[in-house]
Amino acid sequence: MSAKRSIGDPEILKKRIPQNQKYQHVKTRLDTGNSMTKYMERIEEIKKNYRYKKDELFKRIKVSTFAQLVLQVASVSEERESGEMTADELQRLEDNSSVISDTEFLTDRPNGKGSPVSESKSPVQFIDSERGEEFIQTSRSTLQSVISGVGELDLGNQADKEKQSLPSSSALDKPYEDCPFLLLDVRDRDSYDQCHIVGARNYPTAMLSRTMNPFTSEILEYRNAHGKIIILYDEDERIASQAATTMCERGFENLFMLSGGLKVISQKFPQGLTTGSFPSTCLAPPTQTKSALKRTPRDPIVPAENKWRFSSQDLEIIENHVENMLMSTSTPSRLRLDSRNSKVPSSASSARSLSSTSSHSKPWK
């Protein structure tokens, strides 16, 4: 007897769908949730942009996490600076009704000149010593200020004049006070001058080969400090991973490496985080088509600015990019939540119907 043959080709499921290279970059707009295609795209992105290795001594920080950290540090520093101004004004209002003694005024000074060990001067001696020593101006209404004829109005006017004389860009030239992270660019000086993250300090890997003083004072200040971290980055993790491994072997426990480096930043945060022009190795190659007869000219190379803080425009751009990333990642979960919420009323209505039928079936007493 002959065996029964199945209808159709048994290899039909293994047949590959022909793909056209012309439409490879076109992606579907329909979000169907997690799929094998998205998983494979994620794996390809990791292989292309990241260099994960087994038994890494250092820890990693994502670009999106670093952007959120930048936004938090900027907001806290802004609140702190504005809070200091309001605290000075409140202190001035409180001190209008009380006059402190000279001993309290001298012992409140942070430097060593007015320590409690030193002798307290009388108001007359303080006035005489003003001409020979540096006079420290405060917003408090003290006895010697009243005697010398210096009022709070004069101090306020002088402070306003000093603020007006300072340029508006001076705030961007100073790093954030008490910043919780130290950002180090481990590339050479030329690459750093071309493009770097705002607020990053240049620390070439050649510094690690020194036998004497391989670390700067900033690195030693942040080394294993409580509540502070050190972040290294480069273009594509080739140099930063080696530098991070060496520093971890030398006792750094709060060291992180920025995953992906400038290559991932150019894709996810093309503006806002960096200053200058991205290197050509970080930019994606343009797609060439048959219809394109002329090549599009690239943007001219702009050198990096000497910025230590993010401007308000930069922070707004970074916040928009972060929101877009969070929206794209939360869309599948939001769809699942919507589907769950849509199922809840049906189950609740069925429970109500069962309870109503059971109540009607019971005899009334």
From Swiss-Prot:
Where in the sequence does UniProt note compositional bias of the Low complexity kind? 342-365
Q: Where is this region: Disordered?
A: 1-23, 104-123, 329-365
Do you know which PROSITE patterns this protein is assigned to?
Answer: RHODANESE_3
Kindly state one GO CC term assigned in the UniProt record: cytoplasm
Q: What does this protein do?
A: Required during ciliogenesis for tubulin glutamylation in cilium. Probably acts by participating in the transport of tubulin polyglutamylases between the basal body and the cilium.
PANTHER family membership: CENTROSOMAL PROTEIN OF 41 KDA
> What name has this protein been given in UniProt?
Centrosomal protein of 41 kDa B
